[in-house]
């Protein structure tokens, strides 16, 4: 695994869900592709069930501008990330063809910061431990929504923090923020609506 130098805990950790994806197969279906359009497409425009929908690619581009605007200030509550993380799906090729990687690919290219994929979905406690013990600055994690609550609960948040126990299937438009409390090793939890695309909600995810 890629091991960055040991450093102080990150000042900020952002967690986002990947961009819009194809519909899931019908309940009970085995090995079936999504039932119909819209289809996922890879970076070359080929149909691919693991890739983003065209709207997801739009979000990917918009996220690059959200976290690194060409002009004007960043949105309140956000800073430019210096570390980008997404899940591993085995080989490098498979990882780079997956929507979690694709969602921050544009930001990676814009910043010149590689995407690190050391951990698979289901390894959230280990990922959280690595993030707080081996990274510094501002970290952005793009993850699969069913596993984001587990990741959030594995981070050292301030006592009594209410974190949503589920990420709604229809929400692709929120940034979860974890801000290091000065003088402590604990994080304050917050949420920032992205409001990047038509139809994005202005509300946060209820705890």
What are these regions (language model features)?
Residues 142-144:
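Short beta-strand segments
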Residues 139:
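Mobile, glycine-rich extracellular loop/lid and propeptide segments
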Residues 4-136, 147-207:
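Active-site-proximal alpha-helix that buttresses catalytic centers in soluble enzyme cores
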């Amino acid at each position: 695994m890629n091991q960055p130098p040991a450093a102080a805990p990150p000042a900020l950790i952002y967690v986002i869900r990947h961009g819009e994806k194809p519909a899931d197969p019908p309940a009970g279906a085995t090995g079936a592709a999504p039932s119909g359009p819209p289809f996922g497409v890879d970076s070359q425009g080929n149909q691919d069930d693991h890739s983003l929908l065209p709207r997801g690619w739009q979000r990917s581009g918009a996220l690059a501008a959200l976290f690194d605007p060409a002009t004007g200030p960043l949105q309140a509550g956000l800073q430019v990330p210096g570390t980008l993380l997404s899940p591993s799906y085995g080989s490098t090729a498979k990882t780079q063809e997956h929507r979690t990687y694709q969602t921050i690919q544009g930001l990676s290219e814009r910043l010149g910061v590689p995407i690190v994929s050391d951990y698979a979905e289901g390894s959230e406690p280990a990922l959280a431990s690595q993030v707080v013990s081996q990274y510094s600055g501002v970290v952005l994690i793009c993850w699969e929504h069913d596993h984001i609550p587990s990741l959030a609960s594995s981070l050292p948040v301030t006592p009594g923090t209410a974190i949503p126990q589920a990420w709604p299937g229809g929400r692709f438009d929120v940034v979860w923020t974890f801000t290091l409390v000065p003088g402590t090793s604990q994080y304050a939890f917050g949420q920032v609506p992205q409001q990047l695309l038509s139809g994005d909600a202005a509300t946060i995810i209820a705890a």
